[in-house]
Every structure is written in structure tokens, then in C-alpha cells.
Amino acid sequence: LINLDNLPIPARHLVNMEGYFDIGAFHSAKSRSNRVLNIMCSRGCPEKCTFCTTPQMWGSNVRWRKIDDIMLEIKNGVKDFDIGEIQFEDDTITARKKNLIELCNGLEKIGLPWCTPNGIKTNYHLANQPDMFRAMHESGCYQVTLACESGVQRVLDHVVNKRLKVDQIKPAIENAKKAGMLVHTFWILGYPGETFEEINK
């Protein structure tokens, strides 16, 4: 699907949302509320990480929904289900700074806490543009999950096939913490061909 604006807002009224809220299906230990709205603003990822199926599922071209539609979905969640937190499940929510800042501006007006549990790319933008993290935090983001995968450049380059430099990881984590957010990270151990020395590193 190329144009995500052709998608209707999910018909959550057809689902027993209270049942999900009651069992805490959508929230983590750090969640601000058990009444969580899971939402996607975009689809697609330009990366070709060997372990991931996102490009096969959603394509490699990143497409965003209109901000007005995203805000309407959130407002409907608040009105219909008394939502207390938003979790964005996008794979590349930080890939386009312009879209992210526009999203943050809208979220700041709504005033709900939000996070990115799905893991966002620990890329050049996050390592060298701390203003992105500041904008996220000011709009309510209390926690980010950074997809690091490995601390060994050979593994990132030749096993994971991830366009990420090891020396970008620490600055990205530090920038998120300085902005005031909790930081979770994703790591994968035991890739084919990975040595014990590399795992220990």
C-alpha cells in the first residue's frame, strides 16, 4: 500500500479493548498507564537488516500518514477508551526529521505520555542531532527503545547488514538520557559466524 491515507482509522469499537486493558496486554513495567493506544504513523524501512522482515512486509520506502489523521485516531482513543498513553509501533519513526517534529508538535497539544517500544534505528540523526530527542521529550516521550543489535562493527557490516557505526550508539543513548528519557536498547547475541570474543565485547 503506497498511500497510507487510504487506510481507515482502526475500528477499535469492534474489539473488547477493556479486556486488553485489564490484562495489561499493551503496557510494560515502565508504562504510565495500562490504557495504552498502540498506533503506527508510518510503514516501510530502507534498511536491509538480515534478521528483519519489515522490508518484505511494508516495503523499503518510508510512507507517513497525514498528521491530522494520526491526531484524530489518538483523540478518538481518548474519547472512546479514556486512553492514558500512546505507544508508537513504527519501525522508522525517526527516519524523517520533518515528519517527527510535526508529530511532536501535535502530541504536545494532546499532552499524553508516549514511547517507542518497537525499537528505532540508532542512526546518524540521533547521534548528532540531540534536538530530535528534546522535541520528543517535550511532547511527552518518556522512553525510547534504540535498535543497536551489536557493538562490533564487523558484525553490523557483514552479518547484520545494518548501516550503523558503533561510535554512533553511545552518543545516541547519551542524547536521549540528557533529554530526560528512559532508554531501552535491543541487542542480538549469537549471530551465525559471530565469535565468543565478539559476543563478550
Question: Residue spans of the language-model regions?
Answer:
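Glycine-rich beta-alpha loop elements in corrinoid/cobalamin-binding modules
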Residues: 1-8
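Radical SAM [4Fe-4S] cluster-binding motif and immediate context
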Residues: 12-191
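Catalytic cores of alpha/beta
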Residues: 132, 193-201
